[in-house]
Regions:
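Glycine-rich phosphate/ribose-binding loops and adjacent secondary-structure elements
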Residues: 1-73
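C-terminal extensions of enzymes
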Residues: 74-129
Length: 129
């Protein structure tokens, strides 16, 4: 999908990829010359009870988080969700079908993706990509 540029003549124009999803796909696309992208991935997975972390996605509806009091969603995250709430509370919100669960998970996921993209931009500026 990203490897064949033979039919695409760039002429200095940016290349946009619509609907790219997960972190691995984004990194792959960037290394193949994609300049811009958009995605509903962070909010879509939040609606299904998943939060994104540096250690991989967490399915917050899992009972293993029911007693995770005092444990941040992602220990290194600086988003408002991680600063104010723990995994047990987010688990409770999802189990109780509270709309706030999706709001908090989406807020976290968007922050996570923004930080990931910041890192990719820094890698590009430092010629690591």
């Amino acid at each position: 999908m990203f490897d064949d540029d033979s039919e695409v003549e760039r002429k200095g124009k940016p290349r946009h990829l619509l609907g790219i999803a997960d972190e691995e796909s984004i990194r792959h696309a960037v290394t193949r010359g994609i300049d811009t992208l958009d995605s509903c991935y962070p909010t879509r997975v939040a609606r299904h009870g998943t939060v994104l972390t540096k250690d991989g996605p967490l399915k917050m509806r899992s009972g293993k988080y029911s007693k995770a009091f005092g444990v941040k969603i992602d220990e290194s995250c600086t988003c408002p969700t991680c600063q104010q709430y723990d995994r047990a509370y987010l688990w409770h919100l999802f189990k109780a079908h509270e709309p706030l669960a999706v709001t908090l998970a989406a807020q976290h996921n968007i922050h996570y993706m923004n930080e990931m993209m910041r890192g990719i931009r820094e890698d590009i500026m430092e010629n690591k990509i």
